[in-house]
């Protein structure tokens, strides 16, 4: 079992790389933020309804010598999402990674799910992730070093559970979107890669958010992996 990544204030070697993490203020997103910081990334932390939490985390990183920025945007609205990515690029001068951790999950019985519920899940979980990746990828294409896109999905799309019909429908689009982005960006710059992490760490008794963060680092750092969906679920489907 992986131990949480070491985070020693003042001891981080900066690499000049910059990452944007949507939904980075708590949970898996915050673990990804800390993991990226431990690898020398400057980090932009996105939040919407909980921007203050993102600011607190950004302040903690700054105190440890990590360049950081708290940003906000409603992921349902294309314009603000594009403006957020542009702000990150303007602030740091580049974008090397984007990790889309933000998602909503409204649980409830199938008979109570409305078309509006479904649209809301797709707008945020798919539309917001797509626009953030599309906009950030446009910056990466222009960089000789390229960059990495990580879409966060849910491994439960292959073994659905009750009460999550709208959420899992939106998550089912993530693998296809990842593969499409991988092909599209590689046609412009083969150093721009898009991959997906299918996480169910929270549903496994030994799973932690750090396990997911380690997978994100692996996919970002391996330059020869593109267009895959990596399950991080403790072998759940084999049980």
Question: What does each of the following model-derived ranges do?
Answer:
Residues 16-17, 66-67, 94-95, 140-154, ...:
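Active-site loop of short-chain dehydrogenase/reductase
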Residues 25-26:
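Conserved glycine-rich cofactor-binding loop
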Residues 41-55:
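Conserved glycine-rich Rossmann-like NAD(P)H-binding loop of the short-chain dehydrogenase/reductase
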Residues 109-110, 117-122:
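Substrate-binding pocket helix/loop in short-chain dehydrogenase/reductase
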Residues 133-134, 179:
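A short, exposed helix-loop element centered on a Lys and neighboring polar residues
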Residues 150-173, 178-187, 200-204:
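Catalytic loop of short-chain dehydrogenase/reductase
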Residues 208-232, 237:
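C-terminal substrate-recognition "lid" of short-chain dehydrogenase/reductases
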């Amino acid at each position: 079992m992986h131990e949480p990544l070491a985070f020693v204030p003042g001891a981080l070697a900066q690499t000049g790389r910059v990452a944007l993490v949507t939904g980075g203020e708590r949970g898996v997103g915050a673990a990804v933020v800390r993991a990226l910081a431990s690898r020398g990334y400057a980090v932009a932390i996105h939040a919407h309804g909980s921007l203050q939490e993102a600011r607190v985390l950004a302040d903690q990183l700054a105190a440890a010598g990590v360049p950081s920025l708290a940003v906000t945007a409603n992921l349902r609205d294309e314009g603000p999402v594009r403006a957020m990515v542009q702000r990150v690029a303007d602030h740091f001068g580049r974008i090397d990674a984007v990790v889309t951790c933000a998602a909503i999950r409204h649980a409830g019985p199938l008979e109570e799910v409305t078309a509006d519920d479904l649209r809301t899940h797709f707008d945020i979980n798919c539309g917001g992730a797509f626009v953030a990746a599309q906009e950030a990828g446009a910056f990466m294409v222009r960089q000789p070093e390229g960059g990495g896109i990580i879409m966060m999905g849910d491994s439960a799309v292959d073994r659905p559970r009750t009460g999550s019909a709208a959420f899992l429908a939106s998550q089912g689009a993530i693998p296809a979107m990842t593969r499409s982005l991988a092909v599209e960006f590689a046609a412009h710059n083969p150093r721009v890669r898009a991959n997906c992490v299918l996480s169910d760490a929270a549903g496994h008794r030994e799973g932690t958010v750090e396990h997911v963060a380690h997978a994100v680092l692996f996919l970002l750092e391996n330059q020869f992996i593109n267009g895959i969906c990596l399950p991080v679920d403790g072998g759940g489907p084999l049980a």
